[in-house]
Amino acid sequence: MPQWLLNLDGGFLLWLQDVVRNGILDPFFQFYTQLGNAGLLWIALSLLMLCFPKTRKAGFVSLIAMLLGLLCTNVVLKHLVGRTRPWLVVEGLTALVAEHDPNSFPSGHTCAAFAAASAWCRTLPRRWMKSVAVVMAALMGFSRLYVGVHFPTDVLAGMAVGLFCGWLAWLIWKRLAAWRGWEA
């Protein structure tokens, strides 16, 4: 990674730590970021959506999107890029949660969040549901920065991969629906 990018990424994280972090927000973001462990929050919501006819398609498409995101981020990109977690390379940065995977690029939590949100924005019946999905995904990405376990570029890359996987899952759904004669 170029030194100028490390300085920019690290500087932003140190600013967050010094200016934004506080005793009121810390527990919230620690809790919220851990809801994203293994995609738990997004998988649970997707499975819940499968139970209702009006949201069944959204649940199915988001599960496909998250599976694609998992393959892209955690199976391929993290090992291919091998970027070290920020608290290990940014002097003075303290992580608020423990992460056992030493690779940070791209953010898997953010990828899962935006993969689900992207799928939901294409399939949920109400505008407010789509807005909530986007806000929840953005909060997940921000939480990864707030707790100090990802660089901003990790989160941006996770968001991009997640959006792509949501779009790809939607295309897969449309093909499958056309082939099976289901409503797309």
Give residue ranges: language-model regions.
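N-terminal transmembrane-helix/juxtamembrane module of multi-pass inner/ER membrane proteins
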Residues: M1-L40, N74-P102, E183-A184
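Membrane-helix interface segments
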Residues: I24, K54-G59, P125-S131
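Hydrophobic, aromatic-rich transmembrane alpha-helices
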Residues: W42-P53, A113-C121
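Interfacial segments of alpha-helical transmembrane regions
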Residues: L45-L71
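Membrane-water interface at transmembrane helix exits
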Residues: M49, T73, L77-G82, C121, ...
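Alpha-helical transmembrane segments in multi-pass membrane proteins
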Residues: V61, A65-L70, N74, G158, ...
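Small-polar-interrupted transmembrane alpha-helices in polytopic inner-membrane proteins
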Residues: I64-L80, S131-S143
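Membrane-embedded catalytic cores of phosphoryl/pyrophosphoryl-handling enzymes
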Residues: T94-A184
